[in-house]
Amino acid sequence: LPYRAADDQPSIEKLLKTLADRYAWTPVFEGENIIAVTKGKYSINIESGGQLELSGAPLNDIHHTQRELKHYLDELRILCKEHGAGILGIGYHPTAPLPARPVVPRTRFEALADQGARHDMRWGFLTCSVQANYDYANEADMIKKLRVGLALQPIIVGLFANSPFVEGKDSGYRSYRYQLNTRTHERQQTRFMELAFSDN
């Protein structure tokens, strides 16, 4: 969806404003542009390519998280149907080319786009993911959880690979998002892995 559109066309702006009006979300603006909505301890933000991001509240277990996600998706599906839009939970946009500028008019995204020569902007504009944060009791517990998470990462990528298409064509990868991530952040990730599994 475009950020802004004619009266009879769907847009991200209209979707967020309707969420705020109908379901008691509080709109967040940058200048005159709505860029997010919040409710209690969670929020819906827009990323640079127009991706919607649910930032959930801290919850006790995965079942509470699932209920929160279902509630969010139920509201979103109703509005998307009314606005003639759809939801696609996928790691990389299957048909869109790389846009020249961010879809969403935010100062932060414009600044990142201006640094595009130093970053692969496909990462910000065309990818989506699930990010999970885990509490820890102490430093030893944190290290253990970090190492387990990193060790399981290739298996998780294989289980949830869902981004085989790029600009309408088969990319040759089951998870093009993972391939792009590896290529974009290879040096940082290599150093991080060395630190995470070092003895000291």
Model segments located where?
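Loop-rich catalytic cores of soluble enzymes, especially ATP-dependent carboxylate-amine ligases
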Residues: 92-200
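Terminal catalytic/cofactor-binding subdomain
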Residues: 1-118, 126
